[in-house]
Structure formats: C-alpha cells, structure tokens
Regions:
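Short, Lys/Arg-enriched, Gly/Pro-containing loop segments at transmembrane-helix junctions
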Residues: 382-394
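Transmembrane alpha-helices of multi-pass inner-membrane enzymes
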Residues: 347-385
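N-terminal membrane topogenic signal
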Residues: 1-19, 74
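Juxtamembrane loop-helix boundary motifs flanking transmembrane segments in multi-pass membrane proteins
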Residues: 1, 41, 45, 236, ...
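Hydrophobic alpha-helical transmembrane segments of multi-pass inner membrane proteins, especially
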Residues: 18-24, 28, 32, 42-237, ...
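Transmembrane alpha-helix interface/packing and boundary motifs in multi-pass membrane proteins
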Residues: 157-164, 250-255, 289, 349-359
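Long extracytoplasmic/lumenal interhelical loops at the membrane interface
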Residues: 253-295
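Extracytosolic (periplasmic/ER-lumenal) interhelical loops and adjacent juxtamembrane/interface segments
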Residues: 238-257
Length: 404
C-alpha cells in the first residue's frame, strides 16, 4: 500500500459523506429556485444548478489535493498567500465590478471572481501561523499582547478594505478572529477587552463607514424585529425581507413541495417576489423553507451542525497548534456564514449577502469552501504523523521543522 493511498483511506469519510449530502441537497435547492426562470437572458438563470455542479467538480480536486498534502506547508506559504489575498483586494478596488451597490467582484476571463473569499482563506492560514508558530520562531512573541497586535493587523487590514463595499465579507473576520484567538492561547481578559473595544467602534462604523443603503438595511431589520412595521419601506429596502418572512411563515411543517407542486399554478412567494438573481444564492434558505417546510430547514441545519461538530472533534485530535487553529478558523467561518444567511432569511439579521456554505450558488465561494474542507481533512489525515523530529544539541531538545 503506497503512502498516498494510505492517506486517502485515512480521510474522515463521515465528514465527506456529510459534505456530499449537503452539496447534493444544495444543487437540488438551486434547481428548485431557478429552473423555471426565463432562459432568454445572458445569465441563463435556469441553468444555475448545472453551473453549480461544474463549480463543485472544479473544487473537489482542490479538496483532495489539500487533504493528501501535509499541511506543514502553511508555515512557509502563509505570507505569500496573505500578500496575494491583499493584492486581490487592491485589484478589486481598482478594477472591481459594482453590482447593486457592492464592489465585491472582478471579472477574469469572463468569470466573476470574489477576491474577498480568497483573502479570508489566506487570512485563516496566516492567523494559524501567527497564533501557533510565531512564539516558537521568535521568543519575543510569547507575550500574548504582541501576538494579538500582529494578529489584529493581519485580520484588520483586509477587513477594513472590504467592509465598506462588502459588509458581509468584512464581518466574517470577527468570529473567525475571536475563535482563533480563543484557541490560540490568548488570555480571556484580552478577548473581553477586544470585544468591548469593538462595541465602542460599532457606532463609528455605522455612521461614518457604511453606505446609506447598508444603514437602511440595518434600520429595516431593527424595525421588523421590534414590530415597528409602520417605519418599514415595504416597496424599498423592506421589500425582500418582508416577502422572505412571508415565504418562511407560510410554509408550515411540510412546505409547499418540491417545484412548488402543492400550490396552484406553482405560485409560491419565492417565484413571484424573490429577486431572480439572488433566490439561488443569498435567499436559498428562504426557498428551502418554503419548498420543504420546517422539517426541510431543520434537516439542512442539522446537516451543517453535524459537519461543524465533526470539525471541532477533528481539532481536538490535531497533532499541533497550527492544525487546531486551521480547523477552528474554518469552522468559525462556516458558522458565521450559516448564522448570518439563516438569520437574514428569517428576518432576524440585516440582508448583507453572505452565501450559505455548500448550499448557495457561487463559484469562488464553492472553490474556497472545498479547499478549506481539504485543509481540515489534512489535519485529520496527518494527526499521527509527527511534523518534526527531536534533535539534541548540548543536552537540550529542540525541534527542526525542516525534517519530516
């Protein structure tokens, strides 16, 4: 048995099966949300489910490659990856394509790419090395506050670059950073101080950083959850949140059936009132709730929760701190996306356009998601393989990371 095949057999297949189940359900949900759309436009919305399958097929080799290669490469590749991520964000500011007020995409060879997704992927890798390896590489960084400053710069620069144009991608950095900080041996008092400082900054960001339409979305959500419906502009910023809530609330336990089969003339809410270009991406959870009901939504969230719990389990078995931090960062990112997407589809959180992992349509996000799943698998596959050898020099043990 070759070492590579042995690694392949050592993959966490329960996690793979859970992921494949979510991906299959996501493709089916996208089909439900888009197959009936007009096919005369250049977007070909009725074929989005096929496009999603292509993106999955493109991303699976990245998953397999990342899983079978020992993740120790992140120690030397983290800086180039991070700089490339920042370079992508700079390119976005210069040549980005603005869609519905969001400057989040660049067009490369006719394909829209979202640099912020690659930036957060690189950021997770960089933060794992900062929290896990920096104290060993330079003893001065054994002081927690120094590591926190470096990590804050690593996360703060890309977050600040995207938050004004792409609020959702900017906010994802928060839970990712806090989760990795918690696992990265930073004293709890520093986390409390950081959270309190962030709370003080929120009003400044709201009034002086966010655009008017972003403020309006936050205001609309606040009015809806506090039952001030007279202040909600149902023909403007409150249009989509209102109809998404109606779609979810009217679904019942069993829903209106796949392809809206239980509704006369298939006249479901999502077909009539959801934005045609976003029903299969940002509002896919609302479509699932309406089509498959409460049980479908619970089944979906249970599947995602099972995947995240398995990720946490894998983190406990990591051979080193870097692997543990990688897994925690990925789990935190998936949780943030799931929490925000489900929350905005239920009318509990503002509409800021974060895709639902494994379910929402999206090329860039799908490839990043599958690559990060591969990184999690690499931590599991190599959990019993020592990344270093012990050597003795002058009667004292030290580690040599260049040996395998």
């Amino acid at each position: 048995m070759t070492p590579l095949f042995k690694k392949f057999l050592g993959i966490n297949w329960i996690l793979i099966l859970t992921m494949l189940g979510l991906l299959a359900f996501g493709v089916y949900a996208i089909y439900n949300a888009s197959y009936f759309r007009d096919d005369s436009g250049v977007l070909k919305l009725h074929l989005k489910w096929k496009d999603q399958m292509k993106w999955i097929g493109l991303g699976l080799p990245f998953l397999l490659g990342a899983a079978l290669i020992d993740y120790k490469w992140v120690r030397w590749a983290c800086v180039p990856m991070y700089m490339a991520g920042l370079g992508g964000l700079v390119y976005l500011q210069l040549y980005g394509v603005e869609v519905k007020g969001n400057l989040a995409w660049v067009t490369i060879a006719g394909v829209n790419v979202q640099p912020s997704q690659f930036a957060i992927m690189a950021g997770i890798v960089m933060l794992a090395v900062v929290f896990g390896e920096l104290p060993r590489m330079w003893p001065v960084f054994r002081r927690p506050w120094l590591r926190l400053i470096v990590a804050g710069i690593v996360a703060g620069i890309p977050a600040a670059m995207v938050i004004k144009e792409d609020l959702g991608s900017g906010l994802v950095w928060g839970p990712v950073f806090l989760s990795m900080m918690l696992v990265g041996s930073i004293p709890f008092r520093y986390m409390i101080t950081l959270i309190l400082g962030a709370l003080c900054i929120i009003p400044i960001v709201y009034f002086f950083v966010l655009k008017p339409y972003q403020q309006a979305r936050i205001d609309t959500t606040w009015y809806m959850i506090t039952n001030q419906m007279d202040k909600v502009d149902t023909r403007g910023d409150g249009w989509v949140p209102t109809f998404v809530q109606i779609a979810v609330a009217s679904a019942g336990f069993e829903g209106k059936g796949p392809m809206s089969e239980k509704v006369p003339d298939h006249g479901t809410i999502h077909r009539q009132f959801f934005p045609s270009t976003e029903a299969h991406s940002d509002f896919i959870f609302g479509v699932i709730c309406e089509e498959f009901g409460f049980r479908g939504a619970v089944l979906l969230l249970t599947g995602i929760a099972l995947l995240l719990i398995q990720g946490i389990f894998m983190a406990f078995y990591s051979r080193d701190q870097v692997g543990r931090l990688l897994v925690v960062g990925v789990v935190a990112m998936f949780f943030a996306h799931t929490f925000q997407n489900a929350g905005m589809n239920l009318g509990m959180l503002p509409v800021i356009g974060l895709p639902l992992p494994f379910i929402s349509y999206g090329g860039t996000f799908m490839i990043v998601t599958l690559f990060l799943m591969g990184m999690m698998q690499s931590v599991w596959v190599h959990r019993n393989i020592s990344p270093v050898k012990r050597k003795t020099m002058g009667g004292r043990d030290f580690r040599d990371d260049d040996d395998d």
